[in-house]
Amino acid sequence: MPLQWFLKYRPKTLNEVENEEDAKKELVEWIESWLKGKPNYKAVLLYGPPGVGKTTLAEALARDYKLELFEMNASDSRNLNDIRTMAERASITGTIFGIKGKLILLDEVDGLNARADAGAIDAILELINKTKYPIILTANDPWDPSLRPLRNAVKMIELKRLTKYPLKRILKKICEAEKITCEDEALDFIIEQSEGDARYAINMLQGVAEGYGRVTLDMAKNLVRRKDRELDPFEALRGVFWAKYYWQAKSAVTDTQIDYELLMRWLDENIPLQYDNLEDVWRAYDALSRASLFLTRSKLVGWDLLSYTFDLMGPGIAFASLEKKKPTYKAKWVKYQFPQYIQQLAKTKEIRDALDTLLRKIGQAIHASKDKTLNDFLPAFIIYYRKYQEKLDKELELTEKEKDVIKLISSFYEGSKVEIEEPEKKEPSKRRTTSYRRKS
């Protein structure tokens, strides 16, 4: 079986990587800071849609800087012990002659499931914290709430979809190397269907070339189909808000694998950002509320009603703006926001969990229940903590999150103290008061 072209013609060096100049610059600065022994971040997260070259970029970096690449796939190493074992292998395995050091690549971290892969995220964070070598993580969608601890621990570097002309240069080079006749119109068609995915475009080019011996527009139309891919939340929002036709808006909703209730949260958060006119905002929210109603009914009555949910979430919101009826209408660019509702849930859960463990630690030290510690001893502990912070940090083995909770509670007590110590001064009243005794 012939070697797949996307592997055969994969870039070997950073200079050969097309269209990612900003990402390459950031990556080079990061690896050089590591080689100097002063990295600002021990790990980077390369993120972007499938086929943009995340793994390729990591491999090219290792080759340029003569680093031995130690690759792990997060979707294969799914728990605490697996990742720890592979990390230990990376740290003790000797390097090949002539190699300066190692580069650890952890692929597809967004393939981890917070529940099914319990401990995996913690293991990766532990690996980052203790590593002696630079670490690169990759993800298609890094915005999953379960990956938030990772996002906070790494440098984020975005890789963008390949635009038409860089992708066309890649395909032309392959045609020349394989001595295949390729029509420009055929390459344009393949690029359009690939939606910026270089791997998909190269695979389609190879399929046509090996099937016919050359590549013409008619041949490409016979074999190449639009790439079937999942839309991320930002693409889904753009698909809805920027749609000019009914089918475009509906496809934006049906082509994404995001949970429908979660997508509603995204739409809810971003409708006011996209639409300026208050009547447009009202119509959009009216459509969204009806979509929510039909989604609930579909669960109770029958899934046939789900089509109405799609119609209202997509076209209903897309055409809430009457401005779209104007021939000159152009959707404004908006930096879409992650749903605050989900962020707040995540924050409050983190605080609750940290407070719970803090109360348990204090309770164990003073032999009291969690409830009694909260109600009777916590205020005294806060005062004591201000004076003996280092000692208590060590004795109770407090985590950073638990320390943050103490600071939060301490600021609350300090605020209360100010109110008590600095009351509003009032002139004493000169009016005589008389007490009355109630007759029995």
UniProtKB/Swiss-Prot annotation:
Keywords for the protein's UniProt record, in alphabetical order: ATP-binding, DNA replication, Nucleotide-binding
Sample GO molecular function, one term: ATP hydrolysis activity
GO biological process, one term: DNA replication
InterPro entries, A to Z: AAA+_ATPase, ATPase_AAA_core, P-loop_NTPase, Rep_factor-C_lsu, RFC_lid
Residues at which ATP binds: G48, P49, P50, G51, V52, G53, K54, T55
Pfam family, one: RCF1-5-like_lid
Stated family: Belongs to the activator 1 small subunits family. RfcL subfamily.
Quaternary structure annotation from Swiss-Prot or TrEMBL: Heteromultimer composed of small subunits (RfcS) and large subunits (RfcL).
Role: Part of the RFC clamp loader complex which loads the PCNA sliding clamp onto DNA.
Name by which UniProt lists this protein: Replication factor C large subunit
Gene this protein is translated from: rfcL
